[in-house]
UniProtKB/Swiss-Prot annotation:
It comes from the Bacteria. GO terms for molecular function: GTP binding; GTPase activity; translation elongation factor activity. Catalyzes the GTP-dependent ribosomal translocation step during translation elongation. During this step, the ribosome changes from the pre-translocational (PRE) to the post-translocational (POST) state as the newly formed A-site-bound peptidyl-tRNA and P-site-bound deacylated tRNA move to the P and E sites, respectively. Catalyzes the coordinated movement of the two tRNA molecules, the mRNA and conformational changes in the ribosome. The lineage of its organism: Bacteria, Bacillati, Bacillota, Bacilli, Bacillales. InterPro entries: EFG_II (IPR041095), EFG_III (IPR009022), EFG_III/V (IPR035647), EFG_IV (IPR047872), EFG_V (IPR035649), EFG_V-like (IPR000640), EFTu-like_2 (IPR004161), G_TR_CS (IPR031157). NCBIfam families: EF-G (TIGR00484), PRK12740.1-3 (NF009379), PRK12740.1-5 (NF009381), PRK13351.1-1 (NF009891), small_GTP (TIGR00231). This is Elongation factor G. It is found in: Cytoplasm. The keyword Protein biosynthesis applies.
């Protein structure tokens, strides 16, 4: 099957925004106008094409980035709709990594919102060119120029309107095109009746002023255009378009357009802008990778002639075909039924079928080419971030980095039947989502799930119920404490049972002392003269290791201590490995009174980004959570507070930050180190664990 669309005519774009800015609706309209769907689904009615998981339709938010393909004016546009909620940033990270360009959707009333800033930062990290679509122009309080102002103030981005709205709110009925110097008026609500007219008299002055600003901004980035501009020569529409395209694809300039996706206004013009200004796979730098054995850096150009290389960016479990692996082809061609190498894992994989996805319907294709996004069926070992490549020409592409989970809860199946299904469900869900982990707690036997936030884990439990029919009870969030010793001491452990029959006898003297942080447990044998026979010494070490798993104060694992076996005695007949194991654990218990044991807690490095006016409240809040503020800096017109806060005090923080800053603050946290718990808190923990 020959290539249907050339590489120049391919666009891989993402639609990104703050929750509720209307990006799913915008994607819906794109699919409607490009002829992919015949009836438009409304998000608020729960019938949207892109939001196809049940929870998404109920909550009216997008959780997984659905990938879909559309066609417009001889071009193929692959679209990935991303979620806007902060707990799902991993989805946004994944999709940005494989896109060439993006459309940032803003709400015309609010302009740039907190999650917009987070997503914008991620897009800047990956160097993704962007167009800004100011949506909801029909909404009460919509203000286009205010929204453009927020892009400058909150994102420090070089963004300029290439359109102006005609009217706003109920009166929004047209768009002025500053590049082509014309206007588009809308006759009906389906947006199909569009008339291209001259710019209305009353808007001419404003349009001229903004066109002048646009030309000046583009000319600043293009020497040839600058010369013409300074000499007062006329700059043609073609030159201006080429200048905007060049500046946008090099991520130096961001065109701003407007519309109302819900009222079907401005969507076709948005599609035109995607084609005119966002890059094709040929316009972005060639992807870099390394050769597995030599670590030599190589490039893969976007071309069908190059060896095959692709990045798996998402795994999904589909009710009909099983495991789907979404991948972006960077170079070469792939046929269904062929073999590829997963160079990240060093495994050979067979690509059974290749599907082109459209929200939740699919079409089977036999070949994918450079620049395409598709889904493969039949890959067994591939997970998110893995590279798939030609077996004869190995390469590992730069993968994505995912943060460690910060919150965990215990989860229990409601019945025996649920228990059997729960293991399968958890392993499939952790395959799909690299920031979600599940493990069994050795001490309690409970299943613990960990993720990026409270909403994240809610959704996971919800998906277990719906997709895997597993009912489960969820416990309260838990913190992983540790214990350690602060003082050194020599203690005795003696186990003797010698009443009738064969007895048990083990006797040890052990010196305990604190070890450096992060060094774990170290055991040393200092026995001289055979007072404890050599065959029993490993048993002493093993006995201590077992006893350390359930600490001495509150039952948490003991970390970072040294133990040296210095003396002891044995009995020819009654001594055994078991007896020495028990003697060692008795010595550890005896150490409690002498070694000054303490509880350690995980400390999180927290970064809070807030508008300046909330600074006082946030600093007070951090201190009340036993946090230490370690630094502050201005970022644009926002303030960044960096602090070290105990994880146990961070539960519910997202909600409290939201209410303290009217939703304008965002925060991120990562684990940093373990630190001693203050005495008052330590007493509370011990009481709680002893059930007092």
């Amino acid at each position: 099957m020959a290539r249907e669309f050339s590489l120049e005519n391919t666009r891989n774009i993402g639609i990104m925004a703050h929750i509720d800015a209307g990006k799913t609706t915008a994607t819906e309209r794109i699919l409607y106008y490009t002829g992919r769907i015949h009836k438009i689904g409304e998000t608020h009615e729960g019938a949207s094409q892109m939001d196809w998981m049940e929870q998404e339709q109920e909550r009216g938010i997008t959780i997984t980035s659905a990938a879909t393909t559309a066609q417009w004016k001889g071009h193929r546009v692959n679209i990935i709709d991303t979620p806007g909620h902060v707990d799902f940033t991993v989805e946004v990270e994944r999709s940005l990594r494989v896109l060439d360009g993006a459309v940032a959707v803003l709400d015309a009333q609010s302009g740039v919102e907190p999650q917009t800033e987070t997503v914008w930062r991620q897009a800047t990290t990956y160097g993704v060119p962007r167009i800004v679509f100011v949506n909801k122009m029909d909404k009460i309080g919509a203000d286009f120029l205010y929204s453009v102002g927020t892009i400058h103030d909150r994102l420090q981005a070089n963004a300029h309107p290439i359109q102006l709205p005609i009217g706003a709110e109920d009166e929004f009925n047209g768009i002025i095109d500053l590049v082509e110097e014309c206007a588009y008026m809308y006759g009906n609500d389906l947006g199909t009746d569009i008339q291209r007219v001259e710019i209305p008299e009353e808007h001419k002055e404003l349009a001229e002023e903004y066109r002048g600003k646009l030309i000046e901004a583009v000319a600043e980035l293009d020497e040839e255009m600058m010369m013409k501009y300074l000499e007062g020569e006329e700059i043609t529409v073609e030159e201006l378009k080429a200048g905007i395209r060049k500046a946008t694809t090099s991520v130096e300039f961001f065109p701003v357009i407007c519309g109302s996706a819900f009222k079907n206004k401005g969507v076709q013009i948005l599609l035109d802008a995607v084609i005119d200004y966002l890059p094709s796979p040929l316009d972005v730098p060639a992807i870099k990778g390394i050769v597995p054995d030599t670590d030599e850096e190589v490039e893969r150009k976007s071309s069908d002639e190059e060896p095959f290389a692709a990045l798996a960016f998402k795994i999904m479990t589909d009710p009909y075909v099983g495991k789907l692996t979404f991948f972006r082809v960077y170079s070469g061609v792939l046929n269904s039924g062929s073999y590829v190498k997963n160079s990240t894992k060093g495994k050979r994989e067979r690509v059974g079928r290749i599907l082109q996805m459209h929200a939740n319907s699919r079409e089977e294709i036999s070949t994918v080419y450079a620049g395409d996004i598709a889904a493969a069926v039949g890959l067994k070992d591939t997970t998110t971030g893995d590279t798939l490549c030609d077996e004869k020409s190995l390469v590992i592409l730069e993968s994505m980095e995912f943060p460690e989970p910060v919150i965990s809860v215990a989860i229990e199946p409601k019945s025996k039947a649920d228990q059997d299904k729960m293991g399968t469900a958890l392993s499939k869900l952790s395959e799909e989502d690299p920031t979600f982990r599940a493990h069994t707690d050795q001490e309690t036997g409970q299943t613990i799930i960990a993720g990026m936030g409270e909403l994240h884990l809610d959704i996971i439990v919800d998906r277990m119920r719906r997709e895997f029919k597993v009912e489960a009870n969820v416990g309260a969030p838990q913190v992983a404490y540790r214990e350690t010793f602060r003082a050194a001491a020599k203690v005795e452990g003696k186990f003797a049972r010698q009443s009738g029959g064969r007895g048990q006898f083990g006797h040890v003297w052990i010196e305990f002392e604190p070890n450096e942080e992060g060094k774990g447990f170290e055991f040393e044998n200092k026995i001289v003269g055979g007072v404890v026979p050599r065959e029993y010494i490993p048993a002493v070490g093993a006995g201590l290791e077992d006893a350390l798993k359930n600490g001495v104060l509150a039952g948490y694992p003991v970390a970072d201590i040294k133990a040296a076996l210095v003396d002891g005695s044995y009995h020819d007949v009654d001594s055994s490995e078991m007896a020495f194991k028990i003697a060692a654990s008795m010595a550890l218990k005896a150490a409690v009174s002498k070694c000054n044991p303490v509880i350690l807690e995980p400390m999180m490095k927290v970064e809070v980004v807030i508008p300046e006016e909330y600074m006082g409240d946030i600093m007070g809040d951090v201190t009340s959570r036993r946090g230490r503020v370690e630094g502050m800096e201005a970022r644009g017109n926002a303030q960044v507070v960096r602090a070290m806060v105990p994880l146990s005090e961070m539960f519910g923080y997202a909600t409290s930050l939201r209410s303290n800053t009217q939703g304008r603050g965002t925060f991120s946290m990562v684990f940093d180190h373990y630190e001693e718990v203050p005495k008052s808190v330590s007493e509370e923990i011990i009481k709680k664990n002893k059930g007092e």
